[in-house]
UniProtKB/Swiss-Prot annotation:
It comes from Nostoc sp. (strain PCC 7120 / SAG 25.82 / UTEX 2576). The modification O-(pantetheine 4'-phosphoryl)serine is found at residue 40. Pathway: Lipid metabolism; fatty acid biosynthesis. HAMAP family: Acyl_carrier. Gene3D superfamilies: ACP-like. This is Acyl carrier protein. 4'-phosphopantetheine is transferred from CoA to a specific serine of apo-ACP by AcpS. This modification is essential for activity because fatty acids are bound in thioester linkage to the sulfhydryl of the prosthetic group. Carrier of the growing fatty acid chain in fatty acid biosynthesis. Residues 4-80 form the Carrier domain. The lineage of its organism: Bacteria, Bacillati, Cyanobacteriota, Cyanophyceae, Nostocales.
Length: 84
């Protein structure tokens, strides 16, 4: 899966999970907490949705380090590549 395909899937999930009104605000640099107003519960639900969509496990330690959309994309691509 390409970087852009992963980004589009992550973006779709972020928009759904965080009820983002303006999809243009979901950029690679967007911070879940600061730019997209996600609280800790939102973040947990987002991680669960990403795990389900991409069929991966994201340990709590890793999830805590994923603070932007791009970090999520990079983590997912690394996990998918490692399991291929």
């Amino acid at each position: 899966m390409s970087q852009s395909e992963t980004f589009e899937k992550v973006k779709k999930i972020v928009i759904e999970q965080l009820s983002v009104e303006n999809p243009d605000t979901v950029t690679p640099e967007a911070s879940f907490a600061n730019d997209l107003q996600a609280d800790s519960l939102d973040t947990v639900e987002l991680v669960m949705a990403l795990e389900e969509e991409f069929d991966i496990e994201i340990p709590d330690e890793a999830a805590e380090k994923i603070t932007t959309v791009q970090e999520a994309v990079d983590y997912i691509n690394n996990q998918v590549a490692a399991s291929a």
